[in-house]
Amino acid sequence: MKSWVSIVLICTLFYSFRYKMDERVVAQAYIERYSVLAVNEMRRSGVPASIKLAQAMVESNAGRSVLALESNNHFGIKCKSYWKGQSYYHKDDDLDAKGKLMESCFRAYADIDASFKDHSDFLRSSAKYASLFNLDITDYKSWAYGLKECGYATDRSYSLKLIRTIEEYQLYRYDTYLSSEFDLPAYQALTSQIVPIQSTID
């Protein structure tokens, strides 16, 4: 009996380890693909590259969510009354009069670049996020907590998820590339060398 329990435990640990490794491979590929875009948007808009990448990874499950795959929306941004672009309807957290989940209107984009750009413009153009741009661009923790306080997400642990992601994948390194002139080969080398580490958040 003990040997059977041991086998089950070993198998469980193995598959758990394998799953975590697979998740990290997917996450790292996502970072390598979109980090330059995030840095360019940081230089254009002032939104930290670490925050943008972390939000995109959390909101889109590193590009694998239905919303990301079907509408190129990597930040979970809903339509709002003033949105004039394409839309995609998907059940999220909006409830109807009977308290049942109803389809929410999300913004849809022609490509992922447009999603990253609109995320910057969405934050820059809204008065409720204005205070974020008074923060130091390298202060990712204050940005993470500020986004939650400003109402970006309803998830109570949203800030901690962003911070964990930033620290595990060392996304804060990208916030140092604010200058319009930087060594692109060195930057790309940095991207390929980043190895996931343990977050300081429990």
Task: Please give the residue ranges for each predicted region.
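Catalytic cores of secreted/periplasmic lytic hydrolases that degrade extracellular macromolecules
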Residues: K2-S3, L13-D202
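Conserved S-adenosyl-L-methionine
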Residues: S6
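Localized chelating/binding microdomains
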Residues: L9
